[in-house]
């Protein structure tokens, strides 16, 4: 008898594991017409466990054995040596081999003109040589054992013929769609394998999928929205024109939600209550098209809790899963988070695209749950330029091949069709009269936008707010924001000026936002100086404000925090800083777009931020005028050309984290937690566990560090390490823990010695 796993309640026969994995893979693959293909790779994925070496692994006698390669070897050997191929499509064969081979690690290989040479069986004296791919030895002892394994596979009928009904026909000229399909199939295998293993360990049958109930949830959403309308009516604000416009946006979302599966866009100004309107559209889509779930993708970590909480108020905590890097899950919920198994998922763009464009098994486990779903992107213009084309092509594949609707929500109408490779991209607009909506919004908001003559100084900016008690001022960089904050602080004292940037840990940011909201509500003096972390989803309403020249979408987002409800005349300034501020922009693309905004302000004699022709002129100039902004990086283009899933994932990063340092900081409101962790790490020789990484997320600060700032951090922090085992060697990490309390300021967060070398992304 050969076993797949062992446990305190006994071993699991290999046949049992293969059949349960097959059953689950069929269930997952059915959502995108791939039950047959997913069943095949599930039956073969652990064929290498029917070997003496792997049984020794279970007995604790051997380690560093690769069992996954055996199933791929066998499938490839059968493909080239049988008179009748199990499939006539070589890329389907390459996909199946890659999925089986990488189900515990990663999906690798080219899917166009694939090279299968490394899947040829080794010579008889080479079976025990470590594999080039991972340094492990194959589970097979020799050719004789391979023959035994092959005979077992034939007896069990692990290979079956694949027909056109077992997988969809993916356009051969669309490598982005082909790579996405490969990841989807891989995801089904990984999830089925891990879920089957968990079922054996817990001795429980796998749970049924947690899917959406559209009628019930629409009723709850309408009840929740009506309760908000009653509160607004009781406050005497129901007749405000902005609330009437919000009702129109919501109505349009509801009507268009009753459409077919497709790629849609919602173009509506900032402040028109899109959070609930997006959910109305998604639920109507789920009802019409029988979707299983809704996935809401948000651009910034700072706003995900706010949106998730609003949905929880409407639907209840059990319906909404908040999946981001700061959320701690109890063990009974963690499996649902790993799998995205919930009716409503609220996640960040980093998490979402880590799955959509990655190749690692664990993040990809959840990916197949994108099939038969509605995916909603809030503020889609935040897509990085060097990734935009391939990202949109992958997203276009969702409605075409996976029965998934995609909705882009935006306040700035990005015309992606101006990019050289997206000329034919035309999503369906769900707002009935976009131009009329913006014209109404411009009239009712009653906010004067003034483009100031550059260059400005802190003093000249501050002069614009003399006689004003409340204002928001936003800069491109931490250095500039700090300078303005200290200037106002010197003028007013610290009681009425606040600061937000990436130098603050997440708990500190939330506390600042709570303080600012309270002061605004009580009409107390309040000035907030911030970087762009304020721009999306933070529900603040200042009577006046200012924004340093930035990409047009960023300027519009900041303007959306000024006179949000149109209750009083507002004033909003746009300015450029003097040349003494050497580093005015985070990167070259940000600089180019900021300069386009400044150019258009000069060209148009100001900035009418609700003028669609201005937005159109902006994107036309950005995509036509900037070669980098008009196409993806050359490395990504090459990876797409060959459908090279590994090369693609290596280049596909929403955030460039190669110079990122994570610092655990002594934020005073959570000082007990910090002191406890610091003591633990000292006892552990500063080796941090994954559990400690997760538990400290509220007091972490991520910094993109230059050489000088790294020297500063090393003087004031302890470097952290991780061990390969309890007594293994220490492996360096890009993590630190603060050593001295004064490195974290109660007002401005993690200090920086060389502020000119650091900037916010």
Which residues are covered by each model-predicted region?
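Conserved helicase motor
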Residues: 3-9, 301-302, 321-333, 476-479, ...
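Inter-Walker segment of RecA-like/P-loop motor cores
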Residues: 316-357
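SF2 helicase catalytic motif II
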Residues: 350-353, 361-401
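Conserved Walker A/P-loop ATP-binding site and its immediately adjacent core
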Residues: 277, 282-284, 290-314, 415, ...
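Interdomain hinge/linker at the junction between the two RecA-like core domains of SF2 helicases
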Residues: 412-466
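Walker A/P-loop
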Residues: 260-282
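C-terminal helicase lobe and adjacent C-terminal extensions/tails of nucleic-acid helicase motors
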Residues: 399, 459-460, 466-468, 479, ...
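Accessory nucleic-acid engagement/destabilization modules that flank
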Residues: 2-9, 14-223
């Amino acid at each position: 008898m050969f076993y797949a796993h062992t446990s305190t309640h006994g071993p699991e026969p290999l046949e049992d594991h293969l059949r349960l994995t097959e059953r689950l893979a069929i269930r997952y693959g059915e959502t995108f017409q791939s039950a047959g293909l997913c069943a095949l790779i599930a039956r073969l994925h652990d064929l290498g466990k029917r070997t003496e070496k792997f049984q020794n692994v279970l007995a604790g006698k051997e380690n560093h054995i690769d069992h996954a390669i055996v199933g791929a070897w066998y499938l490839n050997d059968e493909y080239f040596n049988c008179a009748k191929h199990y499939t006539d499509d070589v890329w389907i064969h390459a996909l199946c081999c890659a999925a089986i081979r990488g189900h515990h690690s990663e999906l690798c290989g080219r899917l166009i003109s694939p090279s299968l040479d490394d899947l040829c069986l080794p010579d008889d004296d080479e079976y025990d040589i470590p594999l080039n791919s991972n340094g492990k030895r194959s589970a097979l002892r020799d050719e004789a054992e391979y023959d035994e394994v092959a005979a077992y596979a034939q007896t069990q009928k692990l290979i079956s013929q694949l027909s056109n009904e077992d997988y969809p026909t993916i356009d051969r000229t669309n490598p982005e769609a082909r790579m996405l399909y490969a990841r989807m199939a891989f995801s089904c295998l990984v999830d089925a394998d891990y879920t089957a293993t968990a079922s054996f360990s817990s001795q429980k049958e796998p749970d049924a999928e947690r899917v959406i109930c559209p009628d019930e949830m629409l009723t709850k959403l309408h009840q929740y929205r009506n309760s908000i309308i009653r509160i607004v009516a009781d406050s005497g604000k129901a007749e405000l024109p902005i609330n009437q416009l919000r009702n129109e946006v919501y109505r349009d979302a509801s009507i268009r939600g009753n459409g077919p599966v497709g790629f849609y866009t919602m173009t509506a100004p900032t402040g028109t209550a899109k959070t609930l309107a997006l959910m109305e559209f998604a639920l109507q889509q789920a009802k019409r098209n029988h979707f299983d779930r809704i996935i809401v993708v948000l651009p910034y970590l700072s706003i995900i809790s706010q949106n998730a909480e609003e949905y929880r108020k409407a639907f209840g905590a059990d319906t909404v899963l908040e999946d981001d890097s700061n959320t701690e899950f109890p063990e009974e919920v963690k499996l649902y988070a790993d799998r995205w198994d919930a009716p409503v998922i609220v996640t960040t763009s980093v998490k979402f695209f880590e799955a959509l464009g990655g190749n690692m098994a664990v993040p990809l486990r959840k990916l197949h749950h994108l099939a038969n779903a509605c995916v909603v992107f809030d503020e889609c213009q935040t897509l990085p330029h060097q990734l935009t084309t391939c990202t949109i092509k992958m997203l276009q594949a969702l409605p075409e091949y996976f029965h998934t609707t995609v909705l882009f929500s935006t306040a700035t109408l990005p015309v992606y069709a101006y990019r050289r490779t997206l000329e034919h991209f035309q999503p369906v607009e769900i707002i009935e009269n976009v131009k009329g909506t913006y014209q109404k919004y411009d009239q009712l908001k009653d906010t004067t936008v003034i483009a100031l003559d550059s260059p400005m100084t802190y003093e000249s900016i501050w002069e614009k707010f003399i006689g004003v008690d409340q204002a928001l001022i936003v800069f491109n960089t931490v250095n500039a924001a700090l300078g303005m904050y200290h200037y106002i602080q010197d003028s007013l004292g610290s009681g009425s000026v606040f600061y937000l940037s990436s130098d603050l840990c997440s708990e500190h940011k939330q506390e600042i936002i709570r303080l600012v909201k309270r002061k605004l509500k009580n009409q107390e003096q309040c000035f907030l100086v911030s970087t762009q972390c304020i721009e999306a989803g933070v529900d603040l309403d200042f009577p006046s404000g200012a924004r340093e020249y930035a990409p047009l979408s960023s300027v519009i987002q900041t303007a959306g925090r000024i006179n949000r409800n149109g209750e009083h005349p507002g004033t909003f300034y746009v300015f450029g800083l003097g040349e003494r501020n050497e580093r005015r922009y985070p990167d070259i693309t940000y600089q180019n777009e900021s300069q386009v905004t400044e150019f258009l302000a000069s060209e148009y004699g100001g900035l009418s931020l609700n003028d669609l022709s201005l937005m159109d002129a902006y994107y036309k100039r950005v995509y036509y005028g900037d070669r980098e902004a008009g196409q993806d990086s050359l490395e990504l283009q090459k990876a797409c050309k060959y459908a090279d899933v590994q090369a693609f994932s290596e280049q596909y990063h929403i955030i460039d984290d190669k110079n990122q340092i994570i610092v655990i900081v002594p934020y005073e409101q959570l000082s007990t937690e910090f002191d406890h962790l610091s003591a633990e790490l000292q006892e552990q020789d500063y080796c941090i566990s994954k559990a400690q990484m997760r538990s400290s997320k509220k007091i972490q600060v991520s910094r993109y560090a230059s050489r000088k700032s790294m020297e500063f951090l090393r003087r004031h922090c302890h470097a952290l390490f991780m061990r390969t085992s309890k007594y293994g060697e220490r492996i360096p990490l890009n993590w630190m823990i603060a050593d001295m309390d004064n490195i974290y300021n109660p007002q401005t967060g993690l200090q920086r010695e060389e502020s000119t070398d650091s900037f916010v992304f």
